[in-house]
Amino acid sequence: MPVKREQNLKGPALKPFFVRAAYDKITIKTRYLLCQLKKFLYICGCFKLSDMKKKESPNHLLPHYYTDLIEAGCDEAGRGCLAGSVYATAVILPPDYDNPALNDSKKLSEKRRRELRDQIVRDAVAWAVGIVTPEEIDRINILNASFLAMHRALDQLKVRPQAIIVDGNRFTPYQDLPYTTIVKGDGKYQSIAAASILAKTFRDEYMDSIAEEWPFYDWKRNKGYPTRAHREGIQKHGTSPYHRMSYNLLGSTQLEMKFED
């Protein structure tokens, strides 16, 4: 399985189609049509990243790790929670994409994350969400559940990636695709940051919805994480069907679990 080391690539700008200064002045509708054209040409392989002029990304997040490959960024949300499913997202961005606001979802406000989600969904070449339930987490453990959620997201992409980059330091191979794990990748690469934002916002909405049915655990605020209010709710009212029973729900730490590679 080929695994590529991290490189200091710069953000690309597509020169065959427009000059940047002129692009900034055109209408939103024309800009959208150009974006759709670039997506189509990228998917069809009509140009490569090496054919594009490289430029520094204003937010210092790099657009791509692999050169000349259709690349999907992956990240998960909810791994450290006591309750709820784990969500993962895979995102393929256009080859010259540059959104200065993208960052690790944990560093953004809830309002900003929702605004960025709309932009990512609009602009992405492809994106998809994978979900693993609490019952599955208890059966296979949270690490393997995180990998499974990413695989499920990749399965649902409408465009098949040629390479994968993943936030973190561990991953299980997906089909025959090359992949790279990147520690704190959601603060380094735009596609991982985009995946982080989608996974976080979709999971937060899921936790808000089940909080209506189970209001005892303060899920609207803690989203299932082990806060004092959450654990006091468990102590007073017992567990819900959404709790991960393989976790030490009332302790200060989670049960140690043997993770499989």
Regions found by a protein language model. Name each.
Residues E6-F17, A21, T30, F40, ...:
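Positively charged N-terminal leader segments that act as targeting/secretion signals
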Residues A13-P16, G45, S50:
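Intrinsically disordered, low-complexity segments enriched in serine/proline and basic residues
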Residues Y23-K25, Y42, K48:
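Short, positively charged and aromatic/hydrophobic N-terminal segments
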Residues D24, R31-L34:
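Cationic, amphipathic, low-complexity segments that mediate targeting or membrane/lipid association
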Residues T27-K29, C44, Q235:
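Residues marking helix boundaries in flexible regions
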Residues Q36, K48-D261:
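RNase H-like, Mg2+-dependent phosphodiesterase core
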